[in-house]
Amino acid sequence: MANYPTLIDKFCAFEQSQPDQLFLSEPVAGSYKNFTWAEAGQQVRKMAAALNAMGLGKDDKVAILSKNCAHWIMADLAISFAGCVSVPMYPNMTPDSIQQILEHSEAKAIFFGKLDGADQMRKGVPENLMVIGFPFYLEKNTQNWDDLIAAQQPVQGNPVKDSMALATIIYTSGTTGQPKGVMHNFHAVGFAVDKFLNHIHQIKKEIFFSYLPLCHVAEKMLVKCG
């Protein structure tokens, strides 16, 4: 079986080869918050260490519920760096669907961020679940991203050694019934990105506008490191 670079391989390569180049840019309150590859890498690696310090690790499921934002990408990467499995959710799901996914996936924590109607959606999150809030969109009764990473040293190197390990569970939107989860390993995601990039040449410094929800498998793969 052919080997393809995983998204973590690609992220680490960009982090090392172009640390000072812009990776993510997000409009917040009338201005832009920018993150270079190095800056994002530090946040990702420190949050991974924070997740490990909370007792989360290999194959533990961690959910993300937020509209598109820079910290969505960083949270998803941090989950992988911590050895956990990402469970992204559509940011317009009903509380019942949110609860169903969290229970079905056996999620042990959730990143809760930029949302319309956050109070209503929070009703779908079990009270005993660990909730981490994104900067710029911090909700009440959540653990603060910045506070969590402040006390951590970044994890080192590339933690993904097994490309066949489970990377993420992508659930359907639930519009035609209960959401259904599809399991993707690192190899499958790397294969898809590689084949896509074979058809689009000379992409190096173009600006990519993220429009589709990041919980959509194509958007998630290509925005992160495609």
Predicted segments with their positions:
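A short N-terminal helical cap/helix-turn-helix that marks the beginning
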Residues: A2-F23, Q42
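Conserved pre-ATP/AMP-binding loop-to-beta segment of ANL
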Residues: P19-L22, Q152-Y171, Q178, H201-I207
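Conserved AMP-binding/adenylate-forming core of the ANL superfamily
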Residues: F23-C69, I73, L77, T94-Q99, ...
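Conserved AMP-binding A3 loop
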Residues: N34-A38, A167-V193
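Conserved structural elements of the adenylate-forming
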Residues: G41-K46, V182-I203, F208-Y211, M221
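A short helix-loop-beta submotif of the ANL/AMP-binding
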Residues: K61, K67-V87, P91-P95, E103-A109, ...
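Conserved ATP-dependent adenylate/AMP-binding module captured primarily in the ANL superfamily
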Residues: P91-R122, A192-F209
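ANL superfamily adenylate-forming
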Residues: D116-S163
